[in-house]
Amino acid sequence: MKIGIDVGGTKTEGILLDPNGTEIDRKRINTEKSYDGTIKGILSIINHFEDKHGKAESVGMGMPG
């Protein structure tokens, strides 16, 4: 499974894909305005997916800037 994360100015969204690229799960949270808050948010999405579906083989991320 693979995790993709999109960090934006107002929301951070994650998607979990199976090996064929089919969506398994999706989670959206508000983007925190601090560095530490943003990192904690990203980790909360990864932990959500891995706690629910098992360890992912990779994580890809996009963010502005």
Report the location of each language-model feature.
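Short beta-strand-loop/turn "lid" adjacent to the catalytic site in phosphate-handling enzymes
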Residues: 51-65
